[in-house]
Amino acid sequence: MAHLRGFANQHSRVDPEELFTKLDRIGKGSFGEVYKGIDNRTKEVVAIKIIDLEEAEDEIEDIQQEITVLSQCDSPYITRYFGSYLKSTKLWIIMEYLGGGSALDLLKPGPLEETYIATILREILKGLDYLHSERKIHRDIKAANVLLSEQGDVKLADFGVAGQLTDTQIKRNTFVGTPFWMAPEVIKQSAYDFKADIWSLGITAIELAKGEPPNSDLHPMRVLFLIPKNSPPTLEGHHSKPFKEFVEACLNKDPRFRPTAKELLKHKFITRYTKKTSFLTELIDRYKRWRSEGHGEESSSEDSDIDGDPEDGEQGPIWTFPPTIRPSPHGKLHKGTALHGPQKSAEPVKRQPRSQCLSTLVRPVFGELKEKHKQSGGGVGALEELENAFSLAEESCPGISDKLMAHLVERVQRFSHSRNHLTSTR
C-alpha cells in the first residue's frame, strides 16, 4: 500500500461514486476497465477508467505517465481528461466519452475508401502536430489508439508510453511502442524524436487500407528483427498514387528525411481526398449495423471470459489495452502526480532503466513455449528456470535484458546478411 501514498491529493477523500454514475462497461484490458458514465453534477456523459492499483502495480508508472501527459494537453484532437479520484485501491480516471469506437473498430465490417482514410489521417496529423509542438511524442500510434466521437470527431488516445522531449533531451532512446508499428530507430534503441510517430502513422495508413499492419502474420519477436533489416513496407494494390506516395514519405528509414506532421497536412493525399469529419459518421453507422447483424460477437480477447461482456454492445469498446511495449517501472508513483485536473506545469516523468523486453517479449515467448511443451507432454521446469534467470539478472543489473536483446538483434541481422551474401555468390 505504500505506493498509494503518492496519490494523496484533494480528491483522495472524495467518493467518486457520489460524483459519477457507472453505466455499461465499454472496454477492458490487462489492468483496467472502462465504463460509460454520467457526471451527476452536470449530467454530462463521460468515460470512467477504473484501475485496481494493487493488481496493476507493474503498470503504475504507465498510469502516472498517461495522467501527466493528458493533464498537460489542451487540444480538440486529444482525448480530454477531467480528473482522477482514488477510492481505496481503485483509481478512477474520468475521460471524455467517445462513443464512435476506435478506427480499428471501423475497419471490422470491411475495407475503407480512400476518402475515409485520408480524413482520419488528417485528424491524426492534427493531433500529432499539436503534440510535437508541445515537445511530446505519442510513441504508440495505431488504429486502436484513435477514437471517434459519435459526431465523427477523431482524437488520439492511450498516452501510457508517451514521452516528453526537454531542451536538454532532444532525442530519446527508450524501447517502447507496439512491434508492428515501431520505427527502425526505436527498435535499434538509437536516439529518436517525434519522427518515430511519423513512421507509425505510415504503418497505420497501411493498416487502415488493408485491415492490418505489415507483417501481422509473423510473431512480434520476428518483426523486431525484420523492421530494421528489411526495406520499408509499401502500400500494395489498387490505391491512388497520392496515397502510395504519402505512405512512402512516412516510411523513410532515415528519420531525417521523413516529413513533419505539419508538412504532411499539406500533402496532396490529405488536401485532395479529405472531407469534413461528419462524413465519418457513415463509417460509425456501418459498424453499428454490422454489430447489430450479429457480427463480432465472439471476442478473441484474453479477457473475454467475463460473463455478459458489454464490449459487444452497440458502441463497441472505446478504450482498449492492446499489447504494447511499455517501460517497466522500477520506482512507484511520484508524490504530487496531477490527479485533480489539468496542470500545465507538470514535470515529465523520469523512468528507471528497467528492461521492457521482460514483459513484452521474454515472458510471452516463455509462456508460448511452456504451453507447447505441456501439450506435447513435456516438462516445463527447465524453461521456468531459464525465465527466472532473466528476472534475477534484471534485479541485480537493471536493463541487462534489453542490452542482451539488442545484441541478439544485431547478431541475427549480421548472420542473415552473411548467409544471404554467401547464397548470392554461389
Swiss-Prot record:
Main location: cytoplasm
Stretches that traverse the bilayer: none
Catalytic activity: L-seryl-[protein] + ATP = O-phospho-L-seryl-[protein] + ADP + H(+); L-threonyl-[protein] + ATP = O-phospho-L-threonyl-[protein] + ADP + H(+)
Sequence positions that bind ATP: I26, G27, K28, G29, S30, F31, G32, E33, V34, K49
Coiled-coil ranges (or none): none
An MF annotation (GO) of this entry: ATP binding
List of catalytic residues: D140
Composition-biased stretches (Acidic residues): 299-314
UniProt-annotated stretches for the region Disordered: 292-355
Database matches in InterPro entries: Kinase-like_dom_sf, PDC10_dimerisation_sf, PDCD10_N, Prot_kinase_dom, Protein_kinase_ATP_BS, STE20/SPS1-PAK, STK_STK25
Annotated localization: Cytoplasm; Golgi apparatus
Keywords on record: ATP-binding, Cytoplasm, Golgi apparatus, Kinase, Magnesium, Metal-binding, Nucleotide-binding, Phosphoprotein, Serine/threonine-protein kinase, Transferase
Cofactor: Mg(2+)
Regulation: Interaction with Golgi matrix protein GOLGA2 leads to autophosphorylation on Thr-174, possibly as a consequence of stabilization of dimer formation. The C-terminal non-catalytic region inhibits the kinase activity.
Modified residues annotated as Phosphoserine in this record: S278
GO CC, one annotated term: Golgi apparatus
Residues modified to Phosphothreonine: T174
Domain Protein kinase: 20-270
Pfam families associated with the record: PDCD10_N, Pkinase
One BP term from GO: intracellular signal transduction
Enzyme Commission code: 2.7.11.1
Protein purpose: Oxidant stress-activated serine/threonine kinase that may play a role in the response to environmental stress. Targets to the Golgi apparatus where it appears to regulate protein transport events, cell adhesion, and polarity complexes important for cell migration. Part of the striatin-interacting phosphatase and kinase (STRIPAK) complexes. STRIPAK complexes have critical roles in protein (de)phosphorylation and are regulators of multiple signaling pathways including Hippo, MAPK, nuclear receptor and cytoskeleton remodeling.
Family, similarity comment: Belongs to the protein kinase superfamily. STE Ser/Thr protein kinase family. STE20 subfamily.
Subunit note: Homodimer. Interacts with CTTNBP2NL. Part of the core of STRIPAK complexes composed of PP2A catalytic and scaffolding subunits, the striatins (PP2A regulatory subunits), the striatin-associated proteins MOB4, STRIP1 and STRIP2, PDCD10 and members of the STE20 kinases, such as STK24 and STK26. Interacts with TAOK3 (via N-terminus); the interaction promotes STK25 abundance at the level of protein expression and/or stability.
Name of the featured protein: Serine/threonine-protein kinase 25
UniProt organism field: Bos taurus (Bovine)
Organism placement in taxonomy: Eukaryota, Metazoa, Chordata, Craniata, Vertebrata
Gene name of the record: STK25
